[in-house]
Amino acid sequence: MSTEDIYFNPIWDVRMTDTSLRDGSHHKRHQFTKDEVGSIVAALDAAGVPVIEVTHGDGLGGSSFNYGFSKTPEQELIKLAAETAKESKIAFLMLPGVGTKEDIKEAQNNGGSICRIATHCTEADVSIQHFGLARELGLETVGFLMMSHTISPEKLAKQARIMADAGCQCVYVVDSAGALVLEGVADRVSALVAELGDDAQVGFHGHENLGLGVANSIEAVRAGAKQIDGSCRRFGAGAGNAPVEALIGVFDKIGVKTGIDFFDIADAAEEVVAPAMPAECLLDRNALIMGYSGVYSSFLKHAIRQSERYGVPAHQLLHRAGQRKLIGGQEDQLIDIALEIKREQEAEATRA
């Protein structure tokens, strides 16, 4: 698969994608308004952000009982983003089994030009048809190997090869739980770079659950990653994503060219993105437990909701989710865990 038609300015060392309007949807419980999306896209575009991702937190078709309903239909937000951006390309996420081929076509018709297809890191084979369709439609393609911390670099590279052979132009090491630590990122990115060669680029998507989003992203770039994700103000699931404004500051200092103006992106984060956030993304006990136990970052809000519903500690829910090795799409099992903890509490109270 050729990487020649990837949107990549020769002056860049790395292409940045801001995921505030997709990963940030988890933190906002998918309640973005058109005004918020329009203002954020305009600010990111003006700062020089090459790619802006816009969709429900769980991708196309994610608005549902299981994941949470969108306040504004995602296709309307994709269209608005594409109409607002002057230079930035609009990307959209889709998960096989959640989104459909019709969703992909509609997103393209609404102005999306980069299709990012995500699977669990051991299930790349379920994305083959989706990559084929996206390339047939003329879309640029990106693959997400989620929960990449759960398998070895060698196994991850084999999964990346499946995506690349199917038409994926850049395969991401996705640290969905924010559980990877420095060398763990470098080893995985290096393995993918060695496997894919010129067939596809390699990217990295980090979270801040152990406070390593920026450091891990630097490790990824030094290991050969050409695409990096982040969110302004860490606006994302769990403790949030690597903050774009901090990434740009660090990249400037170490000589990594991105085409993004540091002062403009810092202004966008402070003056435009922050007011749209329901609260800051915190590196609190719940987030730390997710990073430490390897829990999918979008579980945070679901765990808090079940904690309030059943009167059990959210951090205990998250820790047990990690022990069970739950993955994205299994959020409903938090109810079973909550009931399990509740029964244990009642039994202990009876013994007392």
Swiss-Prot record:
The active site is at H26 (proton acceptor). Keywords: Aromatic hydrocarbons catabolism, Lyase, Manganese, Metal-binding. SUPFAM superfamilies: Aldolase (SSF51569), post-HMGL domain-like (SSF89000). It holds the Pfam family DmpG_comm. InterPro entries: 2-IPM_HCS-like, 4OH_2_O-val_aldolase, Aldolase_TIM, DmpG_comm, DRE_TIM_HOA, PYR_CT. The lineage of its organism: Bacteria, Bacillati, Actinomycetota, Actinomycetes, Mycobacteriales. One of its GO terms (molecular function) is 2-isopropylmalate synthase activity. Its EC number is 4.1.3.39. It comes from the Bacteria. The keyword Protease does not apply. Belongs to the 4-hydroxy-2-oxovalerate aldolase family. This is 4-hydroxy-2-oxovalerate aldolase. Residues 14-266 form the Pyruvate carboxyltransferase domain. Mn(2+) binds at D23, H205, H207. Disulfide bonds: none annotated. The record marks R22 as: Transition state stabilizer.
